[in-house]
Amino acid sequence: MFDTLPSEILYHIADFLPPNSVCAVGRVSRRLHAIFTPIVYQSITLRATNEWALNVLDVDSFFLHHDYGRAQDCLRHTRHLCFQAPIQLVRFSRCAYYSIFRMTGMDGCSPDAMSEVVAHKQFLRDLELQVSRIFSCLNPHSLRTFEWKLGTCVPTSIFEADGYLARYQPHIEHLNLLTDGTCFHARHGLGGLSQLRTVKDLKWDGIQHREEVESLRGFLRCNHSHLESLSVGFTPSAFANSLSWNHLVGLGPGDGVCRTPTSMTFPSLTQLSLSQITLPSHFPSDECFTFHTLRSLSLRYCPNQLRLLHLLSKEPDKIQLDSLESCFDFLQDDHRHANAISQFLLSFNGLRNLYLHMSNFPPLGSDFVEGIRAHRATLKWLVYHERQLAPLDDSGLFEEDRDVSPNWVGELDHAIDQRQVTFLALSICPRAARTCLEPAREHSQLQLLHLRFSGPERLHLNLAQEIRALLLEIQRASSVGVCAPGSYFQGDNLDTHDPSRSTHIASLQSSALPHLAEAKAFLSFATWAFSPQGIPSLKALAFGDFSHEDRYEAQRFLIRRRDPSKESQATSEYPDFVPFEVADLDTWEGFLGDGARFLAACPGGGLMESPYDF
């Protein structure tokens, strides 16, 4: 019997089961319930399901399904706690402006009569009351991970100097904060960050005010010696523009030059991610922060980041990265360092993951290709997304950034070894993708291919719906014998002597133009890629924008190769592939591992934004 297996084996089995399966197994017997319940409730996520009502968490629902005694028994096993909300349309000023008044402690005031300050206090009070119900059920000193991903201010009772985390959960090792820096009240309540002195991994996005930077600096002063991963993101504003890396490591603004020996160092840091943070214009290697312990570096739209890469490429003690992500706009940086990324890539070897999102960058020619080629023997993942200013009309008076295909894509096989690269993402159209991938298809080891474009460019389209509609039409044509699903895009297979068949195909083709042309091109490429004449190693194909979770859900589509041993052709519109979703963790864990993280790399903008961006 399954429930007679040793506990060690059952724990090992649970590691390979999805959460729903673990819950189901725990109901089989009392022994399995005792073993699997701690696993089920080890990680808890509470959500605000509606971003227009961010003060309404599903805490009430949790206690509705668990009476207080059972909830306390379940939550005492919790080690990882997360509060989360979607961030799609509401990307700034998320607090009191997007809430449902729960009427707790209103003292007879109508919502319309409430001032902005009172409304904000009531909003945080609503959150505090719900969060405190969860806190009351946790075992003291039990949390190892705390995540506040609501994109709002944090109630003061959580992070203040004498708050809950500092008093009852001081052993947190992983801290993830997503706050609303655009809120005018987001300046207080974080003074207790410095009381958490065992944190190894910090991620904080949405910083804008100087008081927040002071809280972060106090935290870094207490944790810099053992911090292993640091991710910091500012939100653009008149305040944040005057803040820089110097403020974080303990230096004043000065002249932008790091030369003070009293700044903090990070001897254990292996992962660093900086977003929209002004970097020093000069960064001597023997002073301030050292990058030489890093194995992963991510720089997203940081002023002077090209200068930093240029300086690092000249250092005698070369940096040895496994992963590099760089997103930047050439119009906002120094023209003298246009080749900084190429020089940096040529300065070391051994890179495994490279993610680049470049806007308005001049043609780099062979130098850039050689920079990628320097890591040909080790490179496994490559993302390259390029955008350039393009005129909106024939007059050329107005321009905006548009996606473009890389000018070096014709040299793809020279730049990368397709026998090594398993994940590849390019801002390229399906037809061009086939042209550059087909010559090396037989020895290619490509498992995940992502044809990227920027979601905001296609907000007026529902690409996912268009592709599904086209698949349905082709399936209907197949069911009445007009054409086989895979032959729709193969003109030489059409029977032109059958009038009814020709008429139906012509109607499909006319309906696909112009608004379905992109969907048709993608399906044509997918038909080839998963066919015997395509890429044998390919397991999944993505199209569109997968950044920021589900923000661009209508501007993306994902398909995978059909497994003949498990799925009949009747389950698919096509014989060789089936659609699936990013949230299908079973599929990802089955054969693609970190595929979802790869698809979300190099976002075109921030998760949180600012009115200054518009």
Predicted segment positions?
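Conserved hydrophobic position(s) of the canonical leucine-rich repeat
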Residues: 78, 143, 172, 199, ...
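Short, solvent-exposed loop/turn at the beta-strand->alpha-helix junction
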Residues: 91, 127, 152-159, 181-186, ...
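N-terminal adaptor/linker regions at the entrance to substrate-recognition repeat cores
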Residues: 1-281, 290-298, 304, 468-509, ...
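Conserved phosphate-coordination/catalytic loops
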Residues: 122-126, 210, 251-253, 335, ...
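A structural signal for leucine-rich repeat
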Residues: 163-169, 190-197, 215-226, 241-267, ...
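Residue-level marker of regulatory loop/turn positions in helix-turn-helix DNA-binding domains and
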Residues: 2, 6, 333, 404
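Leucine-rich solenoid repeat modules
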Residues: 13-16, 68, 134-137, 148-149, ...
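Core solenoid repeat modules with strong leucine/isoleucine-rich periodicity
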Residues: 206, 232-234, 270-271, 275-276, ...
